[in-house]
From Swiss-Prot:
A Pfam family recorded for this sequence: CactinC_cactus
Biased composition (Basic residues): 1-15, 61-72
Source species taxonomy: Eukaryota, Metazoa, Ecdysozoa, Nematoda, Chromadorea
Name of this chain's protein: Splicing factor Cactin
Annotated Acidic residues bias: 389-401
Tissue specificity remark: Expressed in pharynx, intestine, vulva and spermatheca (at protein level).
Species name: Caenorhabditis elegans
GO process terms (BP): gonad development; mRNA cis splicing, via spliceosome; mRNA splicing, via spliceosome; positive regulation of cell migration; regulation of cell migration; regulation of gene expression; regulation of Wnt signaling pathway
GO molecular function, a single term: RNA binding
Gene behind the chain: cacn-1
Length: 657
């Protein structure tokens, strides 16, 4: 069935003749012509109706518009027929080529014959030439537009780059100021720690604390005093005050001139007044008795009243008063008096804020302890309650007095044991503590750690318990050791003068020269059990130590290629500094020894230190690399003052052809 239908379709296709398709095309064309004629007749009819109904003004406007359209069309046709486009405005007499036949069409006959265009008329050649010229002008305009857009984009990019450079410069300036400020703070800290603080160090530290937010500020770890006391303690001569004025200018250039402007101006004015006093210059025509009366007159006035008085004196100085020198000198005294008074008031505000912070912290601690140790209590009679309230008020007054006394020396324990601090920073903070502060901090840490037994005072001990004096016990132990060593009494007496400070002296020797890229090293290795013949005389024990490992970057060719200062390579171990303490060594004439042994990992080795009784051997696991054994390269191996020091650096291998 399917094959028969396909045959019929093929037969029908064959039966169609060209005459049939031509007749269909003719009918379509006839129908389209009829539709076009109908539209044309409709348009003509609408136009005739519009002409019948229009007024004279509308008819005049319509004809004028029609004339303008014809003129524009004729101009366009003339422009197309002309060889030179009108926008060039070139003539035979005025053109950059000095061509007197510029508007005439050049006919290149041979070229036209080769291109097969020899049959073109003069008008056709002119038209093609004009089109080619217009095309070239259009391309030139397009190229100019692209060039201008590229130039504009390039200018925009340069402007954006300048803006980025300007912002980067501002950021770098800000970072530079921050870096300089950090350096100033670091210099201040170092000079204060070393006991050679200058006046600018104390004043800048005071100003930075005064700028902090009272709600978020921490209690300072230094004593707050009136800035004038800092000047008296640090400035002894005219040169000191002159140096202070220059230091203040340098500090304000870094920190900002507008920051604490009044406070720094007051300090500068006081320093200038002290320079005049030190130089023993006369203070105008004011006699000493008159000067005392002037000071008494200033004393009972407020800052606002003194400022008004200063304005009055300035007006008299600018006016035609009789004795300008007198008023000028009086004005100078008034300015110094105002500066001192402002500094005292500012210092009082700082102390009150600090006292309020400490009270708030004390209240929080008391509330926390009460919430943790809250127990149910029985009903108390009203009289007992009143008595207890009076006692509590008295205790609060006493606590306030104690708090005000401890304002200048309370230390935040959290900052000392902050795990985010590196070892040198933590060590610096501990060294900055005074003796009383160190006692308070250690007691607080002992209480926080919940160690056993709990810390109590000597008055709370049970009867029958003997309390030994620490110094006496150390003296007794030192005397017995010297007796066993066979040393002379004179030498033991000389050495017993500071037995307690021996370990601290050793620690100071071990910590000497510690740098920022060094860290404490205590990876001690476990050794086999040791038997000692001298164990019946002295208890064998491991020596104490303070070791350091030095790390840094190895800028070899590979790391220089793949890393930079912003993205540094991993740090590697560059050396070790072993400081092992043997203060109770029986035979001080024999220095401790050390030896290296291999371990399972070939990249590491075991270094073992041997000293003799009463100390056991001690070992550490170190990196297995070749040492630098020259003194100029940092090698040190010595035994002095009971401290065995072994410092060494690893050799650096460099590729050589």
């Amino acid at each position: 069935m399917g094959k028969d239908s396909k045959k019929h379709k093929k037969e029908r296709r064959r039966e169609r003749s060209p005459s049939t398709s031509d007749s269909d095309e003719e009918r379509l064309q006839k129908r389209l012509a009829e539709q076009r004629s109908l539209k044309k007749d409709e348009k003509r009819r609408q136009k005739e109706e519009m002409k019948k109904n229009e007024s004279a003004e509308e008819k005049r406007a319509r004809r004028m518009e029609k004339k303008m359209r014809k003129d524009a069309k004729r101009k366009d046709a003339d422009a197309e027929d002309t060889l030179i486009p009108p926008e060039l405005n070139y003539t035979n007499l005025n053109n950059p080529f000095n061509d007197t036949k510029l508007t005439q069409t050049f006919v290149w006959g041979k070229k036209l014959e080769r291109e097969g265009k020899s049959g073109l008329t003069q008008d056709e050649i002119t038209k093609q030439t004009s089109q080619r010229i217009r095309k070239n002008l259009h391309e030139a305009a397009e190229f100019k537009r692209i060039r201008d857009s590229r130039a504009a984009a390039k200018e925009d990019m340069e402007m954006m780059k300048r803006d980025a450079d300007l912002r980067a410069g501002q950021i770098s300036d800000t970072k530079e100021r921050e870096f300089q400020m950090d350096q100033i703070k670091e210099r201040t800290r170092i000079r204060i720690d070393q006991g050679r603080a200058k006046a600018i160090d104390l004043l800048s530290r005071y100003a930075r604390f005064a700028d902090e937010n009272p709600h978020t500020a921490k209690i300072p770890d230094f004593e707050l005093e009136n800035p004038m006391e800092y000047l008296k303690a640090s400035c002894k001569s005219v040169d000191d005050y002159e140096d202070l004025i220059e230091d203040i200018k340098t500090y304000r250039e870094v920190d900002g001139w507008a920051k604490n402007e009044t406070w720094w101006m007051d300090v500068t004015r006081i320093a200038e007044d002290e320079i005049q006093k030190k130089a023993a210059q006369n203070r105008g025509d004011v006699h000493a008795s008159v000067q005392t009366e002037v000071q008494n007159m200033f004393k009972n006035k407020s800052i606002d009243e003194l400022l008004k008085l200063e304005d009055q004196m300035d007006a008299k100085i600018r006016g035609n008063s009789g004795n300008k020198g007198y008023w000028q000198d009086l004005d100078d005294q008034l300015k110094v008096f105002i500066a001192r008074k402002r500094l005292r008031e500012h210092h009082g505000r700082v102390l009150r804020l600090q006292l309020a912070i400490i009270k708030e912290e004390q209240k929080k601690e008391i509330q926390q302890q009460e919430s943790e140790e809250l127990l149910p209590v029985a009903e108390v009679p009203p009289q007992v309650k009143i008595q207890k309230e009076e006692e509590e008020e008295e205790e609060e007054d006493e606590d306030d007095e104690k708090i005000s006394k401890k304002v200048r020396r309370k230390i935040d324990v959290q900052t000392l044991d902050d795990p985010e601090l590196d070892e040198p920073e933590r060590e610096r903070k501990w060294r900055a503590l005074t003796g009383d502060q160190l006692d308070d901090v250690t007691r607080e840490l002992y209480r926080i750690g919940c160690y056993s037994p709990t810390y109590i005072s000597a008055d709370d001990t049970m009867p029958g318990i003997e309390i030994l004096d620490e110094q006496a016990d150390v003296d007794n132990l030192t005397e017995r050791r010297n007796r066993n060593r066979g040393t002379l009494p004179s030498s033991s007496a000389a050495s017993s003068g500071a037995p307690q400070g021996a370990s601290s002296k050793m620690m100071a020797i071990a910590r000497e020269g510690m740098e920022a890229d060094e860290s404490i090293f205590g990876a001690e290795e476990q050794l086999a059990a040791q038997r000692h013949l001298w164990s019946d005389k002295y208890r064998p024990r491991k020596p104490t130590y303070l070791n350091r490992v030095q790390t840094g970057f190895d800028w070899n060719k590979y790391n220089q290629t793949h890393y930079d200062q912003d993205n540094p390579p991993p740090k590697i171990v560059q050396g070790y500094k072993f400081n092992i303490f043997y203060p109770d060594l029986l035979d001080m004439t024999v220095a401790p020894r050390f030896g290296l042994t291999s371990c399972e990992d070939p990249d590491f080795a075991i270094i073992r230190f041997k000293a003799g009784p009463p100390y056991e051997d001690i070992a550490f696991k170190v990196v297995n690399r070749e040492w630098e054994t020259l003194h100029k390269n940092g090698y040190k191996c010595q035994f002095q003052n009971g401290v065995f020091q072994l410092w060494f650096m690893f050799k650096k291998y460099r590729y050589r052809r």
